[in-house]
Design a protein with these regions (language model features):
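Chitinase-like catalytic core of GlcNAc-active glycosidases
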Residues: 64-256
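Boundary/entry segment of secreted carbohydrate-active catalytic domains
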Residues: 6-94, 220-225
Length: 259
């Protein structure tokens, strides 16, 4: 007789009694602005402990391959850390990425702050890892206001941004290398904000250098500089401003054309 296979549940039991650390999440920008290093009870366990290893390029096997080509992966490395422990657990299912040698950078697709196990795995293999600044594919007023709130200045026209500083402070404290910007929100509130976003990006770089922790931005091709959302699928007239250097500094460092 046929016997049904036992279903293995991939859920923690007695979750309310778990003392293992959770990944670092922020529900609002206000929550982010209130964050301070070391104030969370599990902060030490959520910090990376492995510095970014140096890498070297081996002998080129295929003469037709372009040595300047770069590969960046966007991956759900720890998709259940919000409910499970950010340091792993006894669950049956796990995503153990093992192709680090092919990557130039990894994006932690789940949120702003990669969990420590993922940062350490990337760094052991010499791969920079980025958190994700995610803005919905949307034109709702709520989502437009959320994007605009990111760009709130210390005072009007100051070109200094409190959220930019917090992003750098987060990366420095938890030990990751920058952010992937997935900005797909569009609408009347968003369309004029391209120049202000460029100022935000440049200020981030300036502040990061001032605290001796330079970070990088990777840019997903969705928001144009002046006209809202449009996938140009290349670096061109609608988006080049986000890559255009100023005083030797690029607003963003890598360009992710499309999937």
């Amino acid at each position: 007789p046929k016997v049904a296979a036992e279903k293995v549940e991939d859920l923690p039991t007695n979750e309310e009694k778990q003392l293992r650390p959770k990944e670092v999440k922020f529900d609002t920008w206000d929550d982010l602005l209130k964050w301070e290093p070391g104030k969370r009870v599990d902060d030490d366990l959520n910090r990376a402990s492995v510095p970014l290893a140096s890498r070297f390029q081996g002998k080129q096997i295929n003469e037709q391959a372009n040595p300047d080509a770069k590969i960046q992966a966007l991956s759900n490395m720890n998709s259940k850390a919000k409910d499970h422990a950010s340091v792993g657990g006894e669950e049956f299912k796990a995503y153990a990425f093992d192709y680090w040698q092919y990557l130039d950078s990894m994006v932690f697709w789940e949120g702003l702050v990669p969990s420590a196990d993922v940062i350490d795995a990337a760094h052991r293999n010499g791969v920079p890892i980025y958190g994700t600044l995610f803005y919905n594919w949307s034109s709702s007023i709520k989502d437009q206001e959320r994007f605009a709130e990111t760009l709130k200045e210390d005072s009007e026209g100051s070109k200094t941004f409190p959220i930019a500083r917090k992003l750098v402070d987060l990366a420095k404290y938890y030990g990751f290398d920058g952010y992937f910007i997935n900005q797909e929100t569009t609408g009347n509130l968003v369309e004029p904000l391209g120049p202000k976003l460029r100022d935000f990006l440049l200020y981030t770089k300036e502040y990061a250098k001032s605290v001796n922790y330079p970070i990088k931005y990777s840019w997903y091709d969705a928001m144009t500089y002046e006209y809202g959302r449009y996938h140009e699928n290349a670096l061109g007239e609608y988006n080049y401003n986000f890559m255009q250097p100023e005083n030797g500094e690029n607003p963003v460092d890598t360009f992710f054309a499309n999937f």
